[in-house]
């Protein structure tokens, strides 16, 4: 003789004897309510998937329609973030002040030896960019002469002269800019993970 299974109704929470092993509710009225509930949950799930897919399509479309200027700005932000993480707890390239990171506004800047205006082709070149205190970078116009002295100490005179003589044009496509941004974001995350 087969033992009858007992269950608890999913709708009214009353105990009942199951007629089938897959039975979920105790009566026809509860079955109608349970069916409506399941339909509602299925609709909500499909709506959520549709919204997620729509959001993904919209963000891809926004990324695709960015202008070159917007992409350059985003890449510059990624490069500067990398420089700040790389040079954290080092000394300012110009004056030797310790570079301590601050949460609000950042404790120091990513200063360019050859400025972005004078040498836009070197704006993403990491040997041209070093951690610099805000005083030197903003208030002393980059403190160029001291920056050069600090750069010679770090890289050597030959490399500094190569940077000064570099006039090669670099023309970046939108895909190149997106790739550069991904690379620098990845480098930043790697350094942050190593530091913990």
Predicted segments, located by residue:
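Amphipathic alpha-helical interface surfaces
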Residues: 79, 88-91, 106-109, 125-132, ...
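Short cysteine/histidine-rich metal-coordination sites, predominantly Zn2+-binding motifs
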Residues: 25-30, 43-49, 108-118, 148-156
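Short Cys/His-rich "knuckle" micro-motifs
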Residues: 18-23, 34-39, 102-113, 143-146
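Short Cys/His-centered divalent metal-binding micro-motifs
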Residues: 30-35, 97-100, 128-155
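A boundary/linker detector
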Residues: 1-78, 170-196
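Ligand/cofactor pocket segment of small-molecule handling proteins
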Residues: 66-94, 98
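Short, surface-exposed acidic
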Residues: 155-165
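Histidine-centered nuclease catalytic patch
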Residues: 93-129
């Amino acid at each position: 003789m087969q033992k009858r299974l007992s269950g608890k109704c999913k709708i009214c929470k009353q105990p009942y004897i199951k007629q089938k092993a897959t039975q979920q509710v105790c009566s026809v009225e509860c079955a109608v309510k349970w069916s409506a509930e399941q339909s509602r949950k299925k609709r909500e799930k499909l709506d959520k998937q549709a919204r997620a897919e729509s959001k993904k399509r919209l963000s891809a479309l926004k990324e695709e329609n960015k202008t070159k200027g917007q992409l350059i700005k985003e890449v510059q932000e990624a490069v500067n973030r990398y420089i700040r993480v790389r040079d954290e707890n080092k000394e300012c390239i110009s004056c030797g002040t310790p570079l301590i990171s601050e949460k609000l506004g950042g404790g120091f800047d990513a200063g360019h030896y050859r400025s972005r205006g004078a040498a836009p082709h070197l704006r993403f070149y990491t040997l041209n960019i070093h951690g610099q205190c805000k005083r030197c970078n903003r208030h002393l116009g980059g403190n160029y002469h001291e920056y050069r002295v600090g750069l010679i100490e770090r890289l050597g005179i030959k490399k500094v002269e190569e940077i000064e003589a570099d006039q090669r044009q670099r023309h970046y496509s939108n895909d190149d800019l997106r790739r550069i941004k991904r690379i620098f974001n990845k480098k930043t995350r790697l350094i942050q993970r190593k530091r913990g």
